[in-house]
UniProtKB/Swiss-Prot annotation:
It comes from Myoictis melas (Three-striped dasyure). A ubiquinone binds at H201. Keywords: Electron transport, Heme, Iron, Membrane, Metal-binding, Mitochondrion, Mitochondrion inner membrane, Respiratory chain, Transmembrane, Transmembrane helix, Transport, Ubiquinone. Disulfide bonds: none annotated. Its main location: mitochondrion. One of its GO terms (biological process) is mitochondrial electron transport, ubiquinol to cytochrome c. This is Cytochrome b. Component of the ubiquinol-cytochrome c reductase complex (complex III or cytochrome b-c1 complex) that is part of the mitochondrial respiratory chain. The b-c1 complex mediates electron transfer from ubiquinol to cytochrome c. Contributes to the generation of a proton gradient across the mitochondrial membrane that is then used for ATP synthesis. The lineage of its organism: Eukaryota, Metazoa, Chordata, Craniata, Vertebrata. One of its GO terms (cellular component) is mitochondrial inner membrane. The cytochrome bc1 complex contains 11 subunits: 3 respiratory subunits (MT-CYB, CYC1 and UQCRFS1), 2 core proteins (UQCRC1 and UQCRC2) and 6 low-molecular weight proteins (UQCRH/QCR6, UQCRB/QCR7, UQCRQ/QCR8, UQCR10/QCR9, UQCR11/QCR10 and a cleavage product of UQCRFS1). This cytochrome bc1 complex then forms a dimer. Binds 2 heme b groups non-covalently. GO terms for molecular function: metal ion binding; ubiquinol-cytochrome-c reductase activity. InterPro entries: Cyt_b/b6_C, Cyt_b/b6_C_sf, Cyt_b/b6_N, Cytb/b6-like_sf, Cytochrome_b, Cytochrome_b_C_euk/bac, Cytochrome_b_N_euk/bac, Di-haem_cyt_TM.
Amino acid sequence: MINLRKTHPLLKIINHAFIDLPTPSNISAWWNFGSLLGMCLMIQILTGLFLAMHYTSDTMTAFSSVAHICRDVNYGWLLRNLHANGASMFFMCLFLHVGRGIYYGSYLYKETWNIGVILLLTVMATAFVGYVLPWGQMSFWGATVITNLLSAIPYIGSTLAEWIWGGFAVDKATLTRFFAFHFILPFIITALAMVHLLFLHETGSNNPTGINPNADKIPFHPYYTIKDALGLTFLFLVLLLLALFSPDMLGDPDNFSPANPLNTPPHIKPEWYFLFAYAILRSIPNKLGGVLALLASIMILLILPLLHTANQRSMMFRPISQTLFWILTADLITLTWIGGQPVEQPFIIIGQLASMLYLLLILVLMPLAGLLENYMMKPKW
């Protein structure tokens, strides 16, 4: 009898993607994050769906509807804690996934990489509109500050900001449309993730050495299904520890107060996963300049394939590039810390230096290191 998974029109697609897929035999745990991100997305969609059944997107009742979910709905507190901390896990996996791509030169699969950057931007947009929904102080002021950045665009800025708000300030219309965006975007993310996977399977996975792995491939199942299962176990463990023992550790205390347009919080700051970009935005004392730097901090990922000068794909055998990569990692952690600090010295100057270093590393130092390593690896006889 012919195997059904190889002939059935639907099962055939699943088979080619997750069962009989030829996979390099040497991919490390750094290749687990794709499946972890898929699982994060599923958790977020499921918990979000059940939360949406009880949430009301109206300025008068949004805050109390979230309180009602936590107090009166069966396991509502758990759903909310899993959803809020699930977002943090999602971004943790995203950053590690992107970092892996930079370290091992995965960005040379241009289509896969570009779709990945679009995915990153879409997830960031989803998280931003989602953070506004509980209608706490930080939700309201975060929405006000970030949407206000649109007004920095020359000529059409003010009109654009008011169009997004649906009025002259962040209000009921804004909350309603943000809820609509937050509901639809995860399904767009799912579709994009499928396209991401489609492009990846056109070329096959990269591997730590960066050389062509065709000579030594193994089937995805059972080898990598079991490996992914182990990764998922760790993900669930960390998520449950967060959600059950310290659910508010990564949140902002200001968000326990209902939104009040007449009272500005002393320090307006977004969730931890946006702090690096927020620090870059704040480090430029000009509004439009800050917005452009904010965009550049993410969009710079799109030009990484053009900045690749090394003869080798991976950084595995390139110690100078490795050193610069880890300096970049430390720099991003520094920016994340600065983004959460008040706008005063010495934080201002540290933020400006870290922002400069971020752009300098990616645009100048890493391409130069690639050229230097090419020269050093040339035979000298």
